[in-house]
Amino acid sequence: MDRRLLEILACPICKGKLVYSQDEQELICRFDKLVYPIHDGIPVMLPDSTRPLIER
Protein backbone atom coordinates (compact mmCIF):
# COMPACT_ATOMS: atom_id res chain seq x y z
CA MET A 1 0.00 0.00 0.00
CA ASP A 2 1.25 3.47 -0.89
CA ARG A 3 2.78 5.24 2.14
CA ARG A 4 1.41 8.60 0.96
CA LEU A 5 -2.11 7.19 1.02
CA LEU A 6 -1.57 5.77 4.51
CA GLU A 7 -0.56 9.22 5.75
CA ILE A 8 -3.88 10.78 4.75
CA LEU A 9 -6.30 7.94 5.55
CA ALA A 10 -8.17 8.19 8.85
CA CYS A 11 -10.73 6.08 10.63
CA PRO A 12 -14.15 7.15 9.30
CA ILE A 13 -15.67 6.79 12.77
CA CYS A 14 -13.23 8.59 15.11
CA LYS A 15 -11.01 10.30 12.48
CA GLY A 16 -7.98 8.77 14.20
CA LYS A 17 -4.78 7.34 12.73
CA LEU A 18 -4.86 3.90 11.14
CA VAL A 19 -2.12 1.29 11.40
CA TYR A 20 -1.33 -0.80 8.31
CA SER A 21 -0.94 -4.55 8.76
CA GLN A 22 0.95 -5.71 5.69
CA ASP A 23 0.72 -9.40 6.64
CA GLU A 24 -3.06 -9.34 7.08
CA GLN A 25 -3.77 -6.64 4.45
CA GLU A 26 -5.84 -4.60 6.91
CA LEU A 27 -6.01 -1.14 8.41
CA ILE A 28 -6.41 -1.03 12.17
CA CYS A 29 -7.95 1.66 14.35
CA ARG A 30 -6.55 1.02 17.82
CA PHE A 31 -8.82 3.64 19.44
CA ASP A 32 -12.08 2.07 18.24
CA LYS A 33 -10.55 -1.43 18.15
CA LEU A 34 -11.77 -1.96 14.58
CA VAL A 35 -10.17 -3.54 11.53
CA TYR A 36 -10.83 -2.39 7.96
CA PRO A 37 -10.05 -4.89 5.18
CA ILE A 38 -8.01 -4.15 2.08
CA HIS A 39 -9.25 -5.90 -1.09
CA ASP A 40 -7.05 -5.91 -4.20
CA GLY A 41 -5.03 -3.02 -2.76
CA ILE A 42 -8.13 -0.89 -2.06
CA PRO A 43 -9.02 -0.06 1.57
CA VAL A 44 -12.68 -0.74 2.34
CA MET A 45 -13.49 2.11 4.73
CA LEU A 46 -17.22 1.52 5.18
CA PRO A 47 -18.21 1.15 8.85
CA ASP A 48 -20.27 -1.94 7.97
CA SER A 49 -17.18 -3.67 6.55
CA THR A 50 -15.25 -3.62 9.83
CA ARG A 51 -14.58 -6.40 12.27
CA PRO A 52 -13.57 -6.10 15.91
CA LEU A 53 -9.86 -6.04 16.66
CA ILE A 54 -8.77 -9.10 18.60
CA GLU A 55 -5.42 -8.29 20.17
CA ARG A 56 -3.02 -11.18 20.56
Curated annotation (Swiss-Prot):
It comes from Coxiella burnetii (strain CbuG_Q212) (Coxiella burnetii (strain Q212)). Belongs to the UPF0434 family. Gene3D superfamilies: 2.20.25.10. HAMAP family: UPF0434. This is UPF0434 protein CbuG_1535. It comes from the Bacteria. InterPro entries: Trm112-like (IPR005651). It holds the Pfam family Trm112p. One of its GO terms (cellular component) is cytosol.
